[in-house]
Amino acid sequence: ARSIESCMKLKVPTLAIIIGEGGSGGAIALASSSKVIMLENAIYSVISPEGCATILWRDPKKMLDAAKAMKLSAKDLIELEIIDEIINEPLGGAHRDKNLVLENVKMSISKNLEEFKTMTPEEIYNNRKNKFLRIGRNKGFINNLDELSSLKYKKNNFDQIRKLKKIII
């Protein structure tokens, strides 16, 4: 949570590049980057398919069903607007031609950083914050995209929560 908070406060661009398996709480932290980029065959989710299958069906063997439902592939995630770009890999995967993949990653970094050159620090900060807030509220998750304009940040009042908890106990 602290790494997400720290990243969200930055007024410089940040890039997250997922090259293999981005999972667990670290996946959430990566989502707080200005741009999230994935290799074509990488996967990205807040839980592993095995973990999801165990929770939903109490059977880790149903991991293929879970993986399909989770939409954790680069292709699925770009359609859901969770990630910003897919970096192509050679047929058979990145390990088949490491130099080509490294060149593709280099070009992606350069291209994405170029987008921020004309932005003020405040614009970079606001773009990152709004992008993060849209996750789960964009196409594929909600029906009315017009509601996105009404997103508001509201600070929790922990004193009121503590008082309420005392009443319940």
Describe the function of each predicted region:
Residues 99-169:
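Intrinsically disordered, low-complexity segments enriched in small/flexible residues
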Residues 1-110, 114, 118:
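Conserved catalytic cores of soluble enzyme domains
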